[in-house]
């Protein structure tokens, strides 16, 4: 026990202890039990937690062991994460991560927030008001204006019935309810999964002319905004396919994996950029080159349908997850200046909504705000 330590120093030390150890310490000290529920402490702990890697594969969530050691680099599945509480067979088709919480869309179009470390869940009801559910997106974020306590929200984007434009809804955990809002500023197409960083969500997107942009949704103001890219996209070009995917780097920066494939010349290039400053400090984005992959050097043409990737800045390597539609295979690659190694391959199941994902995840004790209890003992959801 740290009974002789100043309270601030004790808190500082405990904020650096892994979540697995904190969970064991909770029942040993009433003061610590209270501290481990304090939002400000949890915020500090999540920011310092050592991140783990999980993967969504074949409608299940797996923990991964990633070894980045040159020619001995590997990715191994170490086990399936425990099933969601109160459900024996939940199949998950999509995941977004925020502060150690996973927002999961199930195979039967239900929505649940899950802390896989504590096992806590909260099912979120929503009413489908569009026949185009296949094209809807959910992301989890928070209003970060209150530095001591985050106000979590869910953004739902879906195709409307008029001109197939996007419509938007917000779910607030504080009020336990959905509401629609209107914002015409996006006027673009989402080209990648959303990545939540410091409470806000970012997408690689393209405008009506095919020019690429970074789109940000601010959960505090509930407004979209456009941010700068390192390169200028010239719009649609015949026989040229350009794709981009975003990833978070140590919960501080954004990384962009960009691929350009020339179908006429059967050539491709892959570039990865990382933002120069921490997201919380930047009003706009400035980028630096991180990695350029010479496809001809490794005798590969291109990756196909890259859905997610993870960056190791120190080793200057990335782990990439993609799907080969022609061969109907899911694949993991480790890519660096001198390595391009396939480390995992498996038969893909289902359509694109079932494609695999790599997620950097920080085990945390963050609690999920539950719905109000109504007469009869059931929670209002």
UniProtKB/Swiss-Prot annotation:
SUPFAM superfamilies the record matches? F-box domain
UniProt keyword Transmembrane helix, yes or no: no
Database matches in InterPro entries: F-box-assoc_dom_typ1, F-box-assoc_interact_dom, F-box-like_dom_sf, F-box_dom, SCF_F-box_component
The reply on keyword Ribosomal protein is no
- Pfam families given for it? F-box (PF00646), FBA_1 (PF07734)
The superkingdom of the source organism is Eukaryota
Which residue intervals correspond to the Kelch repeats?
151-199, 229-281, 331-379
Q: Which PROSITE patterns match?
A: FBOX
Q: Which UniProt keywords apply?
A: Kelch repeat, Repeat
Q: Which residue range or ranges hold the F-box domain?
A: 1-45
Q: Which PANTHER family match?
A: BNACNNG10540D PROTEIN (PTHR31672), F-BOX PROTEIN CPR30-LIKE (PTHR31672:SF13)
Put simply, this protein is called Putative F-box/kelch-repeat protein At3g17570
Organism of this sequence = Arabidopsis thaliana
């Amino acid at each position: 026990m740290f009974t002789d330590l100043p309270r601030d120093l004790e808190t500082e030390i405990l904020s650096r202890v892994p979540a697995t150890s904190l969970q064991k310490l909770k029942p040993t000290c009433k003061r610590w039990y209270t501290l481990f529920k304090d939002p400000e402490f949890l915020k500090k702990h999540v920011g310092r937690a050592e991140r783990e890697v999980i993967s969504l594969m074949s409608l299940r969530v797996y923990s991964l062991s990633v070894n980045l050691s040159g020619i001995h680099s590997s990715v191994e599945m170490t086990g399936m994460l425990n099933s969601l509480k109160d459900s024996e067979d939940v199949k998950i088709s999509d995941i977004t991560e925020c502060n150690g919480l996973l927002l999961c869309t199930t195979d039967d179009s239900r929505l649940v927030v899950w802390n896989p470390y504590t096992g806590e869940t909260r099912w979120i009801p929503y009413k489908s008001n569009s026949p185009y559910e296949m094209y809807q997106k959910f992301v989890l974020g928070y209003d970060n204006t209150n530095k001591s306590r985050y106000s979590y929200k869910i953004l739902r984007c879906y195709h409307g019935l008029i001109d197939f434009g996007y419509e938007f809804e917000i779910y607030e955990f504080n009020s336990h309810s959905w509401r629609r809002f209107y914002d015409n500023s996006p006027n673009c197409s989402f080209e990648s999964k959303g990545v939540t960083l410091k409470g806000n969500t970012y997408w690689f997107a393209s405008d009506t002319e095919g020019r690429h942009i970074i789109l940000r949704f601010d959960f505090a103001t509930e407004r979209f905004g456009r941010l700068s890219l390192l390169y200028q996209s010239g719009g649609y070009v015949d026989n040229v396919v350009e794709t981009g995917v975003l990833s978070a780097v140590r919960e501080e920066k954004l990384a962009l994996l960009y691929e350009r494939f020339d179908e006429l010349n059967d050539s491709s290039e892959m570039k990865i950029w990382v933002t120069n400053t921490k997201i919380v400090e930047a009003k706009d984005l400035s980028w630096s080159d991180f990695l350029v992959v010479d496809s001809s050097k490794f005798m590969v043409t291109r990756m196909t349908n890259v859905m997610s990737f993870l960056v190791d800045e120190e080793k200057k390597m990335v782990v990439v997850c993609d799907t080969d539609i022609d061969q109907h295979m899911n694949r993991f690659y480790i890519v660096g200046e001198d390595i391009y190694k396939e480390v995992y391959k498996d038969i893909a199941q289902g359509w694109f909504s079932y494609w695999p994902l790599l997620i950097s995840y920080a085990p945390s004790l963050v609690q999920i705000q539950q719905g109000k209890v109504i007469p009869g003992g059931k929670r209002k959801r």
